[in-house]
């Protein structure tokens, strides 16, 4: 286990900046998730930490040691890839042993580590099988086992669940979190899936355009997004972002004082109500456009007033609303998020 420090790290491809001066301190044993859309720089940053990409500027420290010029094998990290990266001609046991044999590890120590990893991941019965005989989830367990036997200072995960179906992703997500808590190994995990990020992370690092938009626990990022980008990216459905003039044109029944510079109001779908709450709130006049049942709850799409601005509510059950019905939607004042569209940042 070891802390990882990323200090003003930059990466340019020719004259094009991909990572624009990132600073991040990862504590010993912490599980950090880098999340953002394709092209935001998260995988590039991970590859620079791993030593698979050169660094244009700044430095990476693992366990207090500057590793900018160290080869990947010298950084004491283990990486789990999206495509498993298993040797198809070797058995599971052979895949687990391979790196240890290359480093000259004693036979007894190899056997101990392989058995321990197999027990942790419940792949003991598969040790004599080839990768082609395994399911996608089993192959990913073997890939994680290969990382575990190294007993590294840190794990790096590069979208390891992207190739799995939805059910397996949920299962493997739980297994990865349980594994990291058991081993207490410093981990950095890359994903574009914000649900995956929210459920795995001790802290999220939300990236956009080669920059860090926000760092915080999943609850902090969800409850208080620092920017319009984070507000629109974290959460499913994403936060409704309503221009202040549209908001004022359709609101009634309350007094709303917003911080200076606010020209955009953010409203979480699960914070909007169909009945007036006891807490201070604003009533919005709306017209029903679409109801999407998704099991025990529904997504209700409504248009505000007579304009074109639509918002989404998450409601329990399947309310019986006719299309184009006029309804009232209530927004609690203490759950509104004020933003400035020019700066893209919160105003409170």
Swiss-Prot record:
Gene Ontology MF terms: ABC-type glycerol-3-phosphate transporter activity; ATP binding; ATP hydrolysis activity
Protein location: Cell inner membrane
Domain (ABC transporter) ranges: 4-234
Pfam families: ABC_tran (PF00005), TOBE_2 (PF08402)
Record bears the keyword Phosphoprotein: no
Physiological role: Part of the ABC transporter complex UgpBAEC involved in sn-glycerol-3-phosphate (G3P) import. Responsible for energy coupling to the transport system.
Family of this protein: Belongs to the ABC transporter superfamily. sn-glycerol-3-phosphate importer (TC 3.A.1.1.3) family.
Protein name (Swiss-Prot/TrEMBL): sn-glycerol-3-phosphate import ATP-binding protein UgpC 3
Species for this entry: Rhizobium etli (strain ATCC 51251 / DSM 11541 / JCM 21823 / NBRC 15573 / CFN 42)
Organism placement in taxonomy: Bacteria, Pseudomonadati, Pseudomonadota, Alphaproteobacteria, Hyphomicrobiales
Gene: ugpC3
């Amino acid at each position: 286990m070891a802390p990882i420090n990323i200090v003003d790290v930059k990466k340019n491809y020719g004259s094009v900046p991909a990572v624009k001066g990132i600073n991040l301190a990862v504590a010993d044993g912490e599980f950090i998730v880098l999340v953002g859309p394709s092209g935001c720089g998260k995988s590039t940053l991970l590859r620079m930490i791993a030593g698979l990409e050169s660094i244009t500027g700044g430095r990476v420290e693992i366990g207090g040691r500057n590793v900018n010029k160290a080869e990947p094998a010298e950084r004491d990290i283990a990486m789990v890839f999206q495509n498993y990266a298993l040797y198809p001609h070797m058995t599971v046991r052979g895949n687990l042993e391979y790196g240890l044999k290359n480093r000259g590890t004693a036979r007894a120590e190899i056997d101990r580590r392989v058995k321990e990893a197999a027990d942790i991941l419940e792949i003991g019965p598969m040790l004599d099988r080839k990768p082609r005989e395994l399911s996608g989830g089993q192959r990913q367990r073997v890939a994680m086992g290969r990382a575990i036997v190294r007993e590294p200072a840190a794990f790096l995960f590069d979208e390891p669940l992207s190739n799995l179906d939805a059910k397996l992703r949920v299962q493997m997500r739980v297994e990865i979190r349980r594994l990291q808590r058991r081993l207490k190994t410093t981990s950095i995990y890359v994903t574009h899936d914000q649900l995956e990020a929210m459920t795995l992370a001790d802290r999220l690092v939300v990236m956009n355009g080669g920059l860090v938009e926000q760092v915080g626990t999943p609850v902090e990022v969800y409850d208080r997004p620092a920017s319009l980008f984070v507000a629109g990216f974290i959460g499913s459905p994403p936060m409704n972002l309503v221009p202040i003039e549209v908001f004022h044109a359709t609101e009634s029944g309350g007094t709303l004082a917003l911080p200076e510079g606010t020209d955009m109001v953010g409203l979480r779908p699960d914070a909007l109500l169909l009945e007036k709450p006891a807490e201070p709130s604003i009533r919005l006049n709306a017209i029903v456009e679409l109801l999407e049942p998704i099991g025990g709850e529904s997504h209700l799409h409504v248009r505000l007033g007579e304009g074109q601005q639509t918002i989404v509510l998450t409601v329990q059950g399947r309310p019986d609303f006719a299309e184009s019905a006029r309804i009232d939607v209530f927004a609690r004042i203490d759950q509104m998020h004020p933003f400035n569209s020019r700066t893209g940042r919160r105003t409170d």
